[in-house]
C-alpha cells in the first residue's frame, strides 16, 4: 500500500491552515510514519505535483490522501477522520 498526502501551498507561499492542522494530527498520532509521500499543490503553479494529482482524482480541496494498492482502484480521502478510521485503524 502507498499513501500520498497532498498539501496546499497558498499563493503567498504559506501552507493552508487545515493542512497545518492535519500535519499536526498526523505527527501527534504517529501516523505520519505511514505516509509514503507528501506533495504540494501550489496555487501559483497549476503543474505542481499536487495540482496534477488533484485534477487526476477530481479533488478541489486540500489536504487530501490517496491510498493505492496493487490491483485496486485508488481511494481518495478529503476528510482526515474518515482516512484515519478506514485506513489507519481498520
Give residue spans per PLM region.
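Acidic, low-complexity intrinsically disordered segments
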Residues: 62-66
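Non-catalytic, surface beta->alpha helical segment in thiol-disulfide oxidoreductase systems
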Residues: 67-90
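Generic hydrophobic, helix-prone segments enriched in Leu/Val/Ile
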Residues: 34-35, 52, 84
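Broad hydrophobic/π-residue packing in well-ordered secondary structure
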Residues: 6, 57, 78-80
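Generic alpha-helical propensity signal that fires on short helical segments
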Residues: 21-23, 53-56, 77
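Thioredoxin-like thiol-disulfide oxidoreductase module
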Residues: 39-61, 88-90
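Local sequence-structure signature of Cys/Sec-based thiol-disulfide redox active-site neighborhoods
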Residues: 1-37
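General "foldedness" signal
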Residues: 17-19, 40, 52, 68, ...
